[in-house]
């Protein structure tokens, strides 16, 4: 039962990489970010408002994280989310963390969301501040401590194809070695 967890900073490419990894491995992908966004919409809030709301209402994070944890326990899944790897580490075969410079991430988010660079940069900075505070308060997890990851990859100057290729090479090598079976 294969479990791959891909975490990272907003705009680092984690969702795109997770989607492609899931496709290649023929596994479903579960995105904590998508679950969080769906909850935000259900509550009638934009993403930043919902992050602030979640800061005061810890049950929001616990709902999202419990879904990821249950999927990890069941196995055969690629999980994606900012905090996901910390939550599912005991069940994950491979944990990857994607990062990039704040400027690169702001450019990516601005293009993806159709907002200005400055707006994207402000949102990233605020989300990261709120996430760091929330995760420390709820789970005592310091999201700056990347020691749980098998691979930390800076995507600042990598194309998405290169990021996917490097990630898949690492995942396939790890899974092939662990299970003595050709996964990829």
Swiss-Prot record:
A molecular function GO annotation: CMP kinase activity
Chief localization: cytoplasm
Protein's UniProt keywords contain S-adenosyl-L-methionine: no
A GO-annotated cellular component: cytoplasm
GO terms (BP aspect): pyrimidine nucleotide metabolic process
Reaction equations catalysed: CMP + ATP = CDP + ADP; dCMP + ATP = dCDP + ADP
Enzyme superclass (EC): transferase
Residues that, per the record, bind ATP: 8-16
Keyword Kinase attached: yes
Keywords for this protein: ATP-binding, Cytoplasm, Kinase, Nucleotide-binding, Transferase
Localization in the cell: Cytoplasm
Family: Belongs to the cytidylate kinase family. Type 2 subfamily.
The name this protein goes by in its record: Cytidylate kinase
The encoding gene: cmk
């Amino acid at each position: 039962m294969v479990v791959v967890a891909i975490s990272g900073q907003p705009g680092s490419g984690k969702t795109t990489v997770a989607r492609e990894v899931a496709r290649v491995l023929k596994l479903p992908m579960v995105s904590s970010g998508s679950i969080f966004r769906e909850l935000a919409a259900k509550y009638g809030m934009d993403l930043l408002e919902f992050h602030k709301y979640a800061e005061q209402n810890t049950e929001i994070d616990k709902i999202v994280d419990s879904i990821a944890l249950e999927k990890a326990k069941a196995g055969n899944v690629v999980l994606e989310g900012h905090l996901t790897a910390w939550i599912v580490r005991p069940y994950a075969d491979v944990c990857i963390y994607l990062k990039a410079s704040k400027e690169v991430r702001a450019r990516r988010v601005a293009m993806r969301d159709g907002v200005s660079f400055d707006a994207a940069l402000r949102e990233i900075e605020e989300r990261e501040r709120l996430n760091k505070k929330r995760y420390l308060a709820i789970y005592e997890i310091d999201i700056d401590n990347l020691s749980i990851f098998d691979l930390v990859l800076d995507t600042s100057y990598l194309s998405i194809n290169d990021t996917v290729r490097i990630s898949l090479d690492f995942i396939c090598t790890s899974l092939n070695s662990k299970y003595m079976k050709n996964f990829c």
